[in-house]
């Protein structure tokens, strides 16, 4: 019993640790920004002095670096990281690890995370099932073939273009106000549950229809580079919210020289303009 009690105390008081590996050689520098609570984090594998909330340049003494401390915000943007271990960093609320060489990212222990920026890596999967507080997600320019957002009901901004998504279920993300899912392989996009949506960028997919009748707050729509034509393009423009007596909305339905399957007739343009939308074709 005593041994068990000691074990529990040890675990509950465990320090928060971030570990990363970089392809940069020893002697080169990395630029990091950290916000932390309490004492300055302890560093191994690099020299420098952390200053909370400020970008600091560190010199590598090893290609594997360990940061021990209560770091709540960690920005390691563009440092040639090949691995990032956050499984012992429970205090983290915001992570910026974009423009690196990460092939995996385990966030299962970062339950306090509200903002995630992991674009321009080599991620093939992203498990966000434990990150229920997540409100801002930027994961563009990876190799994601699936993205399960069913546990992320607090999500407000989603930026996931330039992946390999064939399906995107947004039915659980009713707080969503901005969505960019362009340059994927989507054939269907249902935004009927996203009534707070103000911006939708879904260009460069394979959509044949788009119903916006529930999106009364929408002000900005880019849907060029799809396959919406005939009766479906007419249904789309008729479903646009009426912005009469409001700031004009912006609707980009055709854009050259992008491969274009949309067909928008003058009569369709007139319908959109009649609802105070600026139409770019």
What are these regions (language model features)?
Residues 135, 177-180, 191-193, 198-199, ...:
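Tandem repeat scaffolds
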């Amino acid at each position: 019993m005593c041994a068990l009690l000691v074990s529990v105390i040890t675990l509950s008081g465990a320090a928060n640790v971030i570990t990363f590996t970089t392809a940069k050689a020893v002697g080169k520098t990395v630029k990091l920004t950290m916000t932390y609570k309490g004492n300055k984090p302890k560093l191994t594998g690099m020299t420098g002095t952390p200053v909370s909330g400020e970008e600091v340049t560190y010199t590598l003494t090893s290609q594997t670096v360990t940061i021990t401390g209560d770091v709540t915000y960690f920005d390691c943007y563009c440092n040639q990281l090949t691995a990032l271990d956050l499984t012992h960093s429970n205090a983290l609320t915001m992570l910026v690890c974009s423009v690196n060489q990460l092939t995996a990212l385990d966030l299962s222990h970062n339950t306090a995370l509200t903002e995630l920026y992991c674009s321009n890596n080599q991620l093939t999967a992203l498990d966000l099932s434990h990150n229920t507080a997540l409100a801002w997600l930027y994961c563009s320019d990876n190799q994601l073939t699936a993205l399960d957002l069913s546990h992320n009901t607090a999500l407000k901004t989603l930026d996931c273009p330039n992946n390999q998504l064939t399906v995107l279920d947004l039915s659980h993300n009713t707080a969503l106000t901005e969505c960019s899912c362009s340059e994927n392989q989507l054939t269907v996009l249902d935004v009927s549950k996203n009534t707070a949506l103000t911006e939708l960028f879904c260009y460069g997919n394979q959509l044949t229809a788009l119903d916006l009748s529930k999106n009364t707050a929408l002000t900005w729509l880019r849907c060029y580079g799809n396959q919406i034509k005939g009766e479906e393009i007419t249904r789309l423009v008729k479903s646009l919210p009426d912005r009469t007596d409001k700031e004009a909305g912006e609707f980009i339905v055709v854009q050259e020289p992008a491969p274009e399957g949309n067909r928008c007739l003058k009569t369709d343009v007139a319908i959109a303009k009649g609802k105070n939308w600026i139409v770019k074709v």
